[in-house]
Amino acid sequence: MLILVSPAKTLDFEQPPLTQVYSQPDFLTHSQELIQVCRQLTPSDIATLMKVSDKIAGLNAARFGEWQPDFSLDNAKQAIFAFRGDVYTGFDADSLSEDEIAQTQSQLRILSGLYGLLRPLDLIMPYRLEMGTALSNPKGKNLYEFWGDTLTQAVNEALAESGSDIIVNLASNEYFKAIKPKKLQGQLISPVFKDCKNGQYKVISFFAKRARGMMARYIITNKVNTLAELKAFNLAGYYYSEEQSSPTNPTFLREEQ
């Protein structure tokens, strides 16, 4: 199985990584193109474009200015340890074994507005550039047009290398929109997580994000290879619901917390 997840806005570049093993992102030339565009933006432009505070806009203007593509462990960090946030809390990479971290390198891919498609051990420098940002660039009016078919092709290549034909989409809609499902050369599965609130099952963003991270970890640590094995996911009180599921959207429910 090849797993797709979103990145996180929250970053941790303070704690040292748990391994000295790393790889370099595949699309740094593309990243450099975007950085050149972003460097034309004033902090005020960034605040408006990204809908962030002046403080965060200033921070990211500085990050764009400092960014350079010669990554090492001195100035960058592996993506799986740099990203924090709900999905990554659920995934809990810090407690994986060395073998499991190695497994994530072939089985997990992180969609990114700046870096395109990251392997877990790819080095990144701090940034904020969400996939849904309407950043005008030489290839179009937003990042979806910038990346075009590039990320879909990269997912197909990663899928072929993984030896599986199942893609488990645990990314948000914003990020998965960068992929063209009809061009994927495998079976696409997009799990849904619903929590019971006031007697009704619904997707609650905070819980769903954590559940996505937990499922990504579950696939890695349990060596899940089939849809039947995926349906056995039962962490944090979730259970598979045949009634609420469709062939491409296995649905997991949890009672009120």
From Swiss-Prot:
A single BP term in Gene Ontology: response to hydroperoxide
Cellular compartments per GO CC: cytosol
Stored Pfam families: H2O2_YaaD
Family statement drawn from the similarity comment of this UniProt entry: Belongs to the UPF0246 family.
Protein name, as recorded: UPF0246 protein Sbal223_3241
Organism: Shewanella baltica (strain OS223)
